Amino acid sequence: RTLERGLTYRCGTASNLGVALPTPQFAVLDQPSTASLFQTINRLGAKADFVILDAAGADSPIFRRVVALADTLVTPVNASFVDLELLGRLHPVSSMPGCAGCFGQTVATLREEKLAHKMGRIEWVVVKNRVRAAEKRQLARVDAALQRLSVAQDFRIAEGLSERVAFRELFQFGLTHLDLELIPE
């Protein structure tokens, strides 16, 4: 629920400072069901150029429904082999991909089902999250492994999201660097 909290903080900051911050409409499904998911998408999506569905990565009926509806699935992973194991197994010596990990298998199954029902293809994008410059050696190994997994699991790799102190400090206000010029001194 981090995305929801960030957007809620953003609304509070805009109200407290009396500034107009661009803010998307958003909703949280407290009792997630397929019916409430479709109702919310129809209600909010009618006026939107695109819809972002933020779901926990645990395999559940609502997660499966969200992925089945997606045109693009974005999966953040920490730059660690523990996270990569969820996408696909790597041989400990050669680092060559083996079978899909539990998350990779779930995504593969859902992609196949969507194609079988002629509902289009899900583009899968994996992005390294919380990348710290101090971990250069580990990052090089993770990058190489991700490159091999991307071929085996058919996903695209996006540029990593750096861990920036400034971002962490702005989160409690629901802000980004792009908002700073809108905020009065």
What name fits each language-model region?
Residues C11-T13, V82, A133, F167:
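Flexible, glycine-rich phosphate/dinucleotide-binding loops
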Residues L21-T23, P92-S94, T176-L178:
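Short, hinge-like loop/turn segments at secondary-structure boundaries
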Residues F171-E185:
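C-terminal boundary of histidine-terminating zinc-finger modules
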